[in-house]
């Protein structure tokens, strides 16, 4: 095996995290995978040492302009770009190249959802990159075009999917996700300045306005008898990375907490990157930083008769780059866990 990988948008947070993971991948360490073109736009001509000093193995590599002809000489192409740019590049690449898109361009199936939340030409949808969703692992493994999920939908979907599939909650769910600032990307903005974010929490794009809302609904509705209505509220926190999600929904019956836990334990029994915590222990972002894990806890509110599920992921790893590498592994036919850390970084 001799796999040559390119990254478009290599100097962004997602691109840099993909590089970090590839550098510890067994295929790279054994010489079976090489890191080819590192492409960008605003950082063209700068070295990895300048942009990402935490990756000394690539310190002398230079970011080059995005060029489709150069990409055609690669086996795997990661697109780590803002939405709207991936589709134009992807349509010019040969079908035999594995293209893994970290943007939103190919996530949504419904043209109306795309028009309402993104606008512009809808490029269609690709196999969706959450392998833990029943049926998706095989689709990913057999595909050369894969859409990496959004970070918020990853935490919310994994939190609610077993309950939806078991039909134990009503089709109206509430999701509140607290996120670190790296989710906004590297582009400079006043709202992301330290003076604006440190010591403060702020909700944004509330009341169904966030672009990840239809993606969460799409994922959950796939396993329900009807469309799942999602009320999604993101909250910005003064953290570099991490997402803590609290999802609630009305229980449909008098099911016990022990029975709910059993549903979740069975659903994720064979999933290497999902961990159901012991009773009474709550997920925390620190425990998953730098890892491809999702930590989950389930509970039942006796007062409101609601299911309460909390989940924690690293938005840059399981929420983006880790999912991308996980999908690459499946597409290449190697171990799904290759190069993906399960342990977080603490303190």
Swiss-Prot record:
One of its GO terms (cellular component) is cytoplasm. Signal peptide: none annotated. Pfam families: Semialdhyde_dh, Semialdhyde_dhC_1. Its EC number is 1.2.1.38. The active site is at 151. It is found in: Cytoplasm. Its main location: cytoplasm. One of its GO terms (molecular function) is NADP+ binding. Pathway: Amino-acid biosynthesis; L-arginine biosynthesis; N(2)-acetyl-L-ornithine from L-glutamate: step 3/4. GO terms for biological process: L-arginine biosynthetic process. It catalyses: N-acetyl-L-glutamate 5-semialdehyde + phosphate + NADP(+) = N-acetyl-L-glutamyl 5-phosphate + NADPH + H(+). It comes from the Bacteria. The keyword NADP applies. Catalyzes the NADPH-dependent reduction of N-acetyl-5-glutamyl phosphate to yield N-acetyl-L-glutamate 5-semialdehyde. NCBIfam families: argC. Belongs to the NAGSA dehydrogenase family. Type 1 subfamily. This is N-acetyl-gamma-glutamyl-phosphate reductase. It comes from Corynebacterium diphtheriae (strain ATCC 700971 / NCTC 13129 / Biotype gravis). The gene is argC.
